[in-house]
Design a protein with these regions (language model features):
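Catalytic-loop region of hydrolases
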Residues: 1-45, 59
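N-terminal cap/lid subdomain of alpha/beta-hydrolase-fold enzymes
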Residues: 30, 35-103
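Conserved acidic catalytic loop of the alpha/beta-hydrolase fold
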Residues: 107-109, 113, 120-139
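Conserved hydrolase catalytic core segment
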Residues: 137-179
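Alpha/beta-hydrolase-fold enzymes
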Residues: 161, 167-262
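Short alpha-helix in the alpha/beta-hydrolase fold that links the catalytic acid
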Residues: 287-293, 303, 316-327
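Short beta-strand/loop motif that positions the catalytic acidic residue
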Residues: 306-308
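Catalytic active-site module of serine/aspartate enzymes centered on a nucleophile-bearing elbow/loop
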Residues: 322-324, 328-374
């Protein structure tokens, strides 16, 4: 397969919110469609924790992207109409500078010497990409999961840079349940003896810790309703079971194992730790004197769609309502969409049947509306 990624060298030094700075840092991104002469048809997508910038296929890289059925010619994010941009998060190992990158000061990987990462840093790096393309205002900023929090930071830190926003299954701050789950995921990685304080290699790799972390994640990304419908209490065939005490016996256990096996070596453990903690730290209330509502009221956009799903236990529907109410109080025209999907937090990735009409409909209405001058 080809590689459609492009790279932007960030300003050097690049200051980080929680202290420290990066030198010679860069971020990876991909684009689809054509930027029009007025440069007012750009749509930026910010991702969850683990995806790359490869949102959908293109001529340079025809492999399916992580949102393949949502973006492309004639799809909800119609690249015949919109100039779509997807940025790989700063701190991710999918092409951007991250803990696995070489520190130019030492020639060795940063590992745990990488500065503390905040989602505000992710937002600032994404804004640098947009600015480098000569775009002063995005037609729409779409943020999914962790990327939704990064999107809120983007709009707060760069007022007037976004016309409309689509918030997808995200939150204005992490609730205790989400923090607790991510804490267990990080603990599983750190307690793997091969993690070795962040110093590992392919021969000595924290496979077990990453596997447990992924399994915990998958459990929170879906819903009990889906588990019951798909697996019930169905057991594995005898030849599929593990021949050891307390080994895998139920189909749901095998499903989790398969997910973990496919993920373990595809994402750097230290990057996982950094982005996971950044998700815990983000709190829009910091921008509203301790109030989530007042923090959201500082965001100045024309209109927004806030989408949530009733079975999401990681970012509950009530948090989507908070975002909708706050943006509306700030003066935006807000559409709140509560979807009834059994697939939980991951519904935006798999329940395209419900998400696509909502997102595509909003973008169609945005395209038909006159663009104001801020």
């Amino acid at each position: 397969m080809g590689d459609a990624r492009r790279y932007l060298n960030l300003p050097s030094p690049f200051p980080m919110k929680r202290g420290g700075e990066l030198h010679g840092a860069h971020v990876a991104y991909e684009t689809w469609g054509t930027l029009n002469a007025a440069r007012d048809n750009a749509v930026l997508v910010l991702t969850g924790l683990s995806p790359s910038a490869h949102m959908t296929s293109c001529d340079e890289d025809p492999s399916p992207g992580w949102w393949q059925d949502m973006a492309g010619p004639g799809k909800a994010i119609d690249t015949d109409r919109w100039f779509a941009i997807c940025v790989n998060s700063l701190g991710s190992d999918k092409g951007s500078t991250c803990p696995a990158s070489l520190d130019p000061a030492t020639g060795e990987p940063y590992r745990l010497s990488f500065p503390e990462l905040a989602l505000e840093d992710v937002a600032n790096a994404a804004h640098a990409v947009v600015a480098s393309l000569g775009i002063t205002q995005l037609a729409c900023l779409i943020g999914c999961s962790m990327g939704g929090m990064s999107a809120l930071a983007y709009m707060l830190l760069h007022p007037g840079s976004v016309r409309a926003h689509i918030s997808v299954d995200t939150a204005p701050q992490a609730q205790p349940f989400a923090i607790a789950i991510r804490s267990l995921q990080r603990e599983a990685i750190r307690l793997d003896r091969h993690w070795n304080e962040g110093v590992y290699d392919d021969a000595n790799y924290p496979d077990i810790g990453m596997s447990i972390a992924r399994k915990l994640g998958v459990i929170t990304y879906r819903s009990a309703m889906e588990w019951n419908g798909r697996f019930a209490r169905i057991r594995l065939d005898p030849e599929q079971r593990e021949d050891e005490p307390f080994g895998r016996e139920f189909q749901v256990e095998s499903y989790l194992e398969g997910h973990a096996r496919r993920f373990v070596r595809t994402f750097d453990p230290n990057c996982y730790l950094y982005l996971s903690r950044a998700s815990d730290w983000f709190d829009i209330a910091e921008y509203g004197h301790g109030s989530v509502h007042d923090g959201l009221k500082r965001i100045c956009i024309e209109q927004a769609m806030v989408i949530g799903v009733s079975t999401d236990i990681l970012f509950p529907l009530q948090q989507q309502e908070q975002i909708a109410e706050g943006l509306q109080a700030a003066g935006a025209r807000v559409e709140f969409v509560a979807l009834d999907s059994p697939q939980g937090h991951d519904a935006f990735l798999v329940d395209i049947e419900h998400y696509s009409p909502a997102i595509g409909g909003f973008l169609n209405r945005l395209a038909a509306a006159p663009s104001p001058h801020w």
